[in-house]
Amino acid sequence: MDCGVFEGTVFSGLGHGSFYVSIYARNLRRALGYTPYPGTLNLRVGDAAERLAGCIERARGVRIEPPPIPGERLASVLAFPVEIEGGVRGHIVRPEITVYKGDVVEIVADVYLRDVLKISDGDKVRFRLLDP
């Protein structure tokens, strides 16, 4: 599957990514083969959201089940392999429950992507989906 390259604008999220990545860390490690940095890189893809959604629908994602935490309402997460500019690999994560609209992409990796890519809010980042 080759959907081409997408571009998104970096933005600071609500700060929930680090919390949830930490909670799901063991299951993410088991499913993805690495321990993700505790946080997500948030990108707004704007007009490309519909094309990206179509590509994600056709992609084979990995379902990551939530850990059992009494009293918490957690949902599954779908993860899709991605290559970010500069050859850095990670996964787009799509939680079944989210506060974000369809134009937002959250990416996890085993490194702190903002440092590795030397990016900050407002910068553009290019990425592409990979076959698993």
Swiss-Prot record:
Pathway participation? Cofactor biosynthesis; FMN biosynthesis; FMN from riboflavin (CTP route): step 1/1
Its UniProt entry gives the catalysed reaction(s) as: riboflavin + CTP = CDP + FMN + H(+)
Q: A biological process (GO) annotation for this entry?
A: riboflavin biosynthetic process
UniProt-annotated binding residues for FMN: 98, 106
Q: InterPro entries, alphabetically?
A: RibK_CTP-dep (IPR039063), Riboflavin_kinase_archaeal (IPR023470), Riboflavin_kinase_CTP-dep (IPR023602), Riboflavin_kinase_dom_sf (IPR023465)
List of residues binding Mg(2+): 40, 42
The answer to whether UniProt assigns keyword Flavoprotein to this entry is: yes
UniProtKB keywords = Flavoprotein, FMN, Kinase, Magnesium, Metal-binding, Nucleotide-binding, Transferase
**Cofactor stoichiometry and binding?**
Binds 1 Mg(2+) ion per subunit.
Q: Which residues are recorded as binding CDP? A: 13-18, 111-114
Q: What is its EC number?
A: 2.7.1.161
Which GO molecular function entries does the Swiss-Prot or TrEMBL record give? magnesium ion binding; nucleotide binding; riboflavin kinase activity
The cofactor(s) it depends on are: Mg(2+)
Q: Which family does it belong to?
A: Belongs to the archaeal riboflavin kinase family.
What function is annotated for this protein?
A: Catalyzes the CTP-dependent phosphorylation of riboflavin (vitamin B2) to form flavin mononucleotide (FMN).
What is the protein name given in its UniProt record? Riboflavin kinase
Q: Which organism is it from?
A: Aeropyrum pernix (strain ATCC 700893 / DSM 11879 / JCM 9820 / NBRC 100138 / K1)
Gene that specifies this protein: ribK
